[in-house]
Amino acid sequence: MATVVFFHAHPDDEALASGGTMARLAEEGHRVVLVVATRGEEGEPVPGVLGPDEALGDRRTAEVHASAEVLGVARVAFLGYRDSGMVDDPANAHPDCFWQADVDEATERLNTVLDSEVVDVLVVYDSHGGYGHPDHIQVHRVGTRWVDRRVQAGDRLVRLRWVTMNRDALQASMDAALVEMERAEAVGEEAWSDDAMLEVRRERLESDTFGLPDSEITHGIDVTSVLGRKRLAIRAHTSQIPEDSFFLAMPDEAFAMAFGVEWYVDPKSPRGGKPQSDDLLLR
């Protein structure tokens, strides 16, 4: 059995980006480890969700542990950096934020966290962090540096994977969602889709820093058998994701269409014309 480490930026990223893969690997008997760079202090909490004097970072720490339990994660660890906020947020300049961290120093922290693990695969984001988030980009840099150092030290077996979004598949899902919205409106039904969320995603899809085209993606992991656990893990993040959110309100069949496959890249093995692999551990 393998040890697969998922390195994420904030609590909830693990559930949204890779929760299905984590649950599937755990069910198959592999050791799944989650490392989180920050505690998500700069997130925007759902109104009224925090208790008196409850710090958002503390709440999100508890939420990621709950999510990890649902997904079958064997261990959760934090690097100890502060959330950097979104692009151009003033929090980007905070001296303790992950974005400001020296990459070598952060790599040493990651190495300390993983010193007791025999890592077979490390999962980070693609080179632009999925959608350009500073902390996601930094995860890519630090995780890549860690793997490079391991290889230089003689570990030829450790593998790197990028979790990403399939730009083409997401466009198809959005087109289908819009068709369903129009149908529901035409017959007077209440549509589950969130117009604002769809518009945000459409704007992001127009950017070259959002996900990757299907032709560059080497792994498409079918997670339909564990989608219930993925959705429960998402639901654990109550400070960030309300019950009426896009992620939780959609019918099961729509959720399966949108999230039934999770996408990865093996940066050492360009896809070319090869079919996508359904096994994250295979080169």
Regions found by a protein language model. Give the residues of each.
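Active-site rim/loop-helix segments in enzyme catalytic domains that contact anionic ligands
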Residues: 1-118, 144-153, 265, 273
